[in-house]
Amino acid sequence: MDKIDLLLQQIDFPIFYLKVVLSFVFSFLITWYSIPTIIKISRRKNLMDEPGQRSSHERKIPNLGGIAMFFSIAVCASIFAYQLFDLYKFLFASLVILLYVGVMDDIVVMRAYKKLIAQIVVAALLVIGSDVRIRSLFGVFGVYELNYFLSVIFSIVTFIILVNAYNLIDGIDGLAGVYGVICFSLFGISYYRLGEYNYPLVILSTTIIGTVIGFLYYNLSDRSKKIFMGDTGSMLLGFLLTFTSICFMDIFIVKKVQGAVFYHLNTAPVMAIAIMILPIIDTLNVIIIRLAEKRSPFDADKNHIHHKLL
């Protein structure tokens, strides 16, 4: 990959900005060109989302758009932000497992407990294997540094909650995608302002933004082109948003890492939560309503915020 950097350096343009532009353009194009093939195969094999009582659509729609999103992110991040896979060695493996789980759920609908077990494995792989964890709450609720065991458990639970919370907001066309673009834009700008050590995370953010915009072109199109991201796409975005949130908080932890600059910000957890506030509030809202009605918090209904706004 160093040869790619050397090649890009031959162009009279700052290499970081060139990577940002190329990652956005290529991720958009890969998604944009991949989805028509996925739509064609989905229709031929009848791999479609059936309309139901809670559905916002009235006919069968292909729901494997998340496959194109994964492919685009994996290719572009591996080329333009390869440092992430050196630093977080289990990140790609986690995404591949999540892809498998998402596709299985989109095609045959997995049992909830099986999907939960898979999510725990994926989260544990990244948290323990790559040490991506919440180390401190910066004084929120009077809690500062967490011991290793508590940090691991809390981080895994956070991954599971946020991945599923993000999945829940994918109920109407464009919502999960547009919200993802907003969140990754905010994180990307924040990482850019926090110095060169975080530039790979900026490139990851622009890669995801390009990918999602390429998907939204079809998701918001007419019937012949429409496709959903499915659980594959929503879990992928939720997982990567949680990953970038924890990495954002980790910037403000004092640690000895070559090239890293220490910044002091006690409100880091609050800022990360604020960026992801919609899925968090929506999940709390539906759980409270279901418990108040003496129903299981896992029951499906139309009490989500986006359903109320329709």
Annotate the PLM regions.
Residues V96-V101, A118-R133, F154-N164, G180-L186, ...:
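Membrane-embedded alpha-helical core segments of multi-pass
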Residues I107-V108, I161-C183, S234-M235:
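Short acidic, Gly/Ser-rich segments with clustered Asp/Glu that frequently serve as metal-coordination loops
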Residues D2-I41, N46, F70-Y100, L175-L310:
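Alpha-helical transmembrane segments
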Residues H57, I107-L116:
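Aspartate-rich (DDxxD/NDxxD/DxxxD) Mg2+/diphosphate-binding motifs
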Residues I61-S78, A124-S130:
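A generic, lipid-embedded transmembrane alpha helix
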Residues D106-R111, L137-L146:
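Membrane interface segments of multi-pass transport proteins and intramembrane proteases
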Residues S56-P62, F141-I153, F262-A272:
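Short aromatic-rich membrane-water interface segments that cap or initiate transmembrane helices
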Residues E50-N63, K226:
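Juxtamembrane helix-capping/reentrant segments at transmembrane boundaries
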